[in-house]
Amino acid sequence: MIAKQKIKILIGVIIVIATYHFIVSSNVRSKDLSDLVDLGSSDKSTTENERPKNNIVTNNRLDNPPNEDIPHAEPDSPPQEPPKSGNKPDFSIFFEGLEKFAIKQPGIKDKYTSEKAKEKFSTDDNFLFGKEYLENVLDIPQATFKELKDSHKRYVDEHIPKMLQRVKTFGSLAPSDKEWESYKGSSGYIIVGGGRFTWLSFLVIKQLRATGAKLPVEMFIATESDYEKEFCEKVLPKYNARCNVFDYKLADDLKKRFDIGGYQYKMLALLSSKFENVLYLDSDNFPTRNVDYLFESDLYKENNLLLWPDAWARTTNPKYYEIAGVPVKENKLRYSKYDEKQAGGKDKLKPLSEYTFKDSWYHDFEGTLPDPTSETGMFMVNKSSHLKTLLLCLYYNVFGPQYYYPLLTQGSAGEGDKETFIAAAHVMKEPWYQCARQFKWTGYVSKVDNKFTSKALAHYDPVQAQDTTRQDVDIIFMHLSYPKFYPNWLADNHDLVYADTDEHIRMYSSINKNVGYDFDLRVMQFFTEGLCPNYYDSKTGKPIENIPHIDYTNDYMGNHLMYVKDEEQNNIDRCNKVFIPHLKWLKETAEIPTVVS
């Protein structure tokens, strides 16, 4: 009897304890519960009631439950970084590990055995740019040569194949991204801005739209200090253009790691562009016609890399081809003007097979890049089809200033990035096409010394220029390299008005018949309305001339760009004395009707 009572009491105690435990358990804080759940969670979610009953917590870690996978990371380890959002492009992959290919030997820029390579036109017939001459311009130590060759080979043979497994275009998008569908086949223009270059680029965009071009434009902005919110968000959208603002942190990182800047921004603009097909323009390169059609031309679609020629003879060091692993054979492919002169005329030229490296221009032989050099103030490229080319081009530009720029040009005219595109395509055996017609020096005969003064380079339509017998080839670009349209440059150097006589100058009149309008007048109109606050009536905000569709608030760039605003007082004086009178004179003397708005 007593035993039965003890059993009943024991059962009662157990029930009380169980009830108390249940009440306490039901009041456990939700945070504590969630912590426990998180600690034991695997890829397959499990509720508290579904957990095996024998799970126990020790030292803040959940022992591995039966029939449940071990988590990939320890619960107390740092959380993994989430995937990059499609809205935040990550371009750092293109620069990962590039230090492995850095050349440790001192740079070879300006390291000449006696003097830099001679600056001669590609049509020069007096100087022999032979192999012996070209390989003795730069002083390249053997240790530097070996390191360059090793770095180049490893980058091409090891790094590029690995990159091709990771990326499908020269940019941040992948075929699995939702934006890929709109990216594939897209086309547009890119131009580099920032500070005074934003001002020049804006003039180019105005001119581009005046030609009737419709495709979108990106203005690349590399640094935070160069971003101008008002201009980027209110002005450019009116022209179907936008600011392409590069990742500031990455830009700073690249500056510290590789001293990226200047010419190299061109590669960053390409890399970060939202267009697959790109027509790049320098900020002083003005289209004269609507060039949208080039993207649809068979010439572009067949090659996917279009270039335009410079005037200069190629001065690439023969050791570059050894470094790049490109064999050059003593098999002459073409004649030069030098050959013609040495022979005493075209009809006296000996067979190509009889020429050697000693008696002919080196870059007329098999395996070399042909004359003339390239002018990359404009070029077109497909970032997917020519991914290998652009990857190598990136390498050439990252290590360009101290090594590859000198190798490719040896201090001759225009040393910089301009030969890196054609060289990279040549090495990677991807197609390219360079316009068959060289540019036209554009300017006028100065009344000061009665000599021709060159002011711009007029480049031709590469499609029309395929017919080398055709004379009436359209001029489609005007590279206004000297002078550039900076107000102080134009005024102080008397580029628009003779200093002694106050007589006005029309710098580009020789192209007007070709393009069908007064090019000086068109560009000067855009320049004046953007630069001169006194071009507008102070009361109405309308221009002092009867020009529709423009006003002070929207079209005077002092309201939007610090470069213009900071010089406002000086510009008012320049506008009164030079720019407004010059614009008026251009209109009064125009021989071809010209739409200026």
From Swiss-Prot:
Pathway: Protein modification; protein glycosylation. Belongs to the MNN1/MNT family. The chain crosses the membrane at residues 7-27. Residues 1-6 are cytoplasmic. Its EC number is 2.4.1.-. GO terms for biological process: cellular response to starvation; filamentous growth; filamentous growth of a population of unicellular organisms; filamentous growth of a population of unicellular organisms in response to biotic stimulus; filamentous growth of a population of unicellular organisms in response to neutral pH; filamentous growth of a population of unicellular organisms in response to starvation; iron ion transmembrane transport; mannan biosynthetic process. Alpha-1,2-mannosyltransferase required for cell wall integrity. Responsible for addition of the first alpha-1,2-linked mannose to form the branches on the mannan backbone of oligosaccharides. Addition of alpha-1,2-mannose is required for stabilization of the alpha-1,6-mannose backbone and hence regulates mannan fibril length; and is important for both immune recognition and virulence. Promotes iron uptake and usage along the endocytosis pathway under iron-limiting conditions. This is Alpha-1,2-mannosyltransferase MNN2. It is a single-pass type II membrane protein. One of its GO terms (molecular function) is alpha-1,2-mannosyltransferase activity. Glycans are attached at N382. Its cofactor is Mn(2+). Coiled coil: none annotated. It comes from Candida albicans (strain SC5314 / ATCC MYA-2876). Disruption phenotype: Decreases the ability to extend O-linked, and possibly also N-linked, mannans. Leads to hypersensitivity to cell wall-damaging agents, and to a reduction of cell wall mannosylphosphate. Also leads to resistance to killing by the iron-chelating protein lactoferrin. GO terms for cellular component: Golgi apparatus; Golgi membrane. Enzyme activity is regulated by iron. Keywords: Glycoprotein, Golgi apparatus, Iron, Manganese, Membrane, Signal-anchor, Transferase, Transmembrane, Transmembrane helix. It is an enzyme of class 2 (transferase). Residues 39-89 are annotated as: Disordered.
